[in-house]
Amino acid sequence: MLMMFPLVGQAQASVVVVDSCDAYDQVTSALGIGNDKLDFTTYNGTFASVDVAASICTVELSASSGLEGILGSYLKTDTVGETLVIHFEEEVRSVGGFFFMVDKFQLPVIGILELELSDGTSFLTSLTEDGGFAGFISNTANIESLSLRGFGPSMFAAPAVSSLKFGVVPSPAGLALLGIAGVARRRRRSV
């Protein structure tokens, strides 16, 4: 289970924090944010970094020690005590995922998830031993990176991610096309 500080749905500095994948999907949909998803359960072995080109954004995952993929489970830092950095190349307005911390024996431990926005604002979320979903949605500032690091007992753990959702706000031209498509569909139904 994921414990959130601040708790579900609290808005601060135009950022909504959620601890449910369903809530994340509902809020991003209501704000017109188009989402994409990445699954890291297919990675196996060690990597200096991982660059993934998704349909709406390029995402880079890195750690100073490199990354290790555990097939069927997650992608984590190669060394305990490192910070897992997820960097977005394009203008991302929402990010959420299933995050957790594992020790050198691959056992889950508690940890802290930190989100850094492009304006320098940061938000913290506490992860329980089971990890869980954490989502952050901004309606004003772009999210450039997400850092997952361990504090306290989890300083001797490796941050991990199994899947990631992220979204962009459609451009005004994209919104206009969506509006035209909606009008065309409505006319077709009324005929």
What is the predicted function of each stretch?
Residues 8, 110, 172-174:
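Intrinsically disordered, low-complexity segments enriched in proline/serine/threonine
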Residues 169-186:
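A short, hydrophobic C-terminal helix/tail in secreted or cell-surface proteins
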Residues 1-14:
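Sec-dependent, cleavable N-terminal signal peptides
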Residues 14-168:
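Surface-exposed, well-ordered secondary-structure segments
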Residues 188-191:
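Short, charged juxtamembrane terminal tails flanking transmembrane helices
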Residues 13, 136-137, 175, 186:
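Short stretches within intrinsically disordered, low-complexity N-terminal or propeptide regions
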